[in-house]
């Protein structure tokens, strides 16, 4: 009997280097700068259909920020936040704006197209907003 060798590798840890950018190169570059603290852009919102890598980019940005000892807050699936969670994110945004740190958030649609509280949608749209495109 011959033993078969299966080529099974563990899932790669999300990094900005292993994200396949495709048409999302500008968004990726902005995240690299923000998560390393080398830009004035401190608020980034990513949106698009599932499978575009939003969660990968959030996790990778958080890891890079830790390497640079940068305070970074991420918010995934903003479109699914409850009223209380939206208020908490709004307050977090304002605290970061008055102090230091970076906020990267993502959702399924542009900030003003998700039925979020008006104050939160406005804040999310104040920063850099990128629609992520899936690879074809």
Features from the language model and the residues they span:
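Interdomain "pre-motor" coupling segment immediately N-terminal to P-loop NTPase/helicase cores
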Residues: 1-5
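Dynamic helix-loop-helix/coil hinge segments at AAA+ ATPase domain boundaries and subdomain interfaces
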Residues: 6-28
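Phosphate-binding P-loop
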Residues: 33-41
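Walker A/P-loop nucleotide-binding motif
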Residues: 40-57
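P-loop NTPase Walker A phosphate-binding motif
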Residues: 55-68
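Conserved P-loop NTPase "ATPase switch" module shared by AAA+ and STAND
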Residues: 69-88, 92-95, 99-109
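Short regulatory helix/loop adjacent to the ATP-binding pocket of P-loop NTPases
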Residues: 111-125
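Conserved AAA+ ATPase "SRH/arginine-finger" region at the nucleotide-binding site
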Residues: 127-136
């Amino acid at each position: 009997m011959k033993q078969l060798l299966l080529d099974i590798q563990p899932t790669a840890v999300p990094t900005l280097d292993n994200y396949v950018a495709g048409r999302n190169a500008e968004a990726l570059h902005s995240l690299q700068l923000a998560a390393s603290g080398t830009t004035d852009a401190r608020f980034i919102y990513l949106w698009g259909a599932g499978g575009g890598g939003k969660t990968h980019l959030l996790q990778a940005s958080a890891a890079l920020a830790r390497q640079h000892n940068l305070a970074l807050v991420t918010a995934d699936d903003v479109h699914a936040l409850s009223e209380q969670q939206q208020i908490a994110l709004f307050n977090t945004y304002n605290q970061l704006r008055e102090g230091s740190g970076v906020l990267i958030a993502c959702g399924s649609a542009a900030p003003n197209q998700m039925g979020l509280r008006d104050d939160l949608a406005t804040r999310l749209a104040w920063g850099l907003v990128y629609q992520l495109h899936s690879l074809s």
